[in-house]
Amino acid sequence: KASQHVVVANELLDNLAFGIAERVEGGWAPVHIGLGLSELSLQVQQPDPALDHLTGLAPDAALSDRVPVASEARAWVADACVLARRVLVFDYAATTAELAERGQASWLRTYAAHTRGHDPLDQIGQRDITHDVPTDQLPTPYLQQTQADWLAANGMGDRVEAARQVWTERAHIGDLQAIAARSAI
């Protein structure tokens, strides 16, 4: 039974290991890193029945559309739900169908020294590789909402408006109150 604890995961799930699947004739196929003639490349494997669930999540995906397969994120959330009564997750996210439509270049990112890269095979081991989390591949949540909606529901809109008022009144003074208000906007 879950304890009375709360687990908060801020931009964690997008950093867990994930796979990539491509829509092919006959289903979905894993995409692996392989050695081409002289360099590494992303290589599409044979369709895998273990990925058939993606058809239900992205029924309109076109051939060659790719999506992340978030098995580790799903397992992490499931484990956290066993340990804690509440699990709050903040992350870049969308549905599997939305990710398929947007394309791999929009949901797969690399970073090194806070600078975004482009090719996930460039400088392997020296860059972080992240992805937008497919929410429909996670355990079904009690409540799912955008960060903006969550902040508004928890009074952030009122706080921002109050800070905006202080900034309007004190910006010309430039004191600590004005600076604090500006940082809250």
How does the language model describe each region?
Residues 50-185:
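Long, Lys/Arg- and hydrophobic-enriched amphipathic alpha-helices
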Residues 8-57, 101-113:
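A mobile, often basic/glycine-rich helix-loop segment
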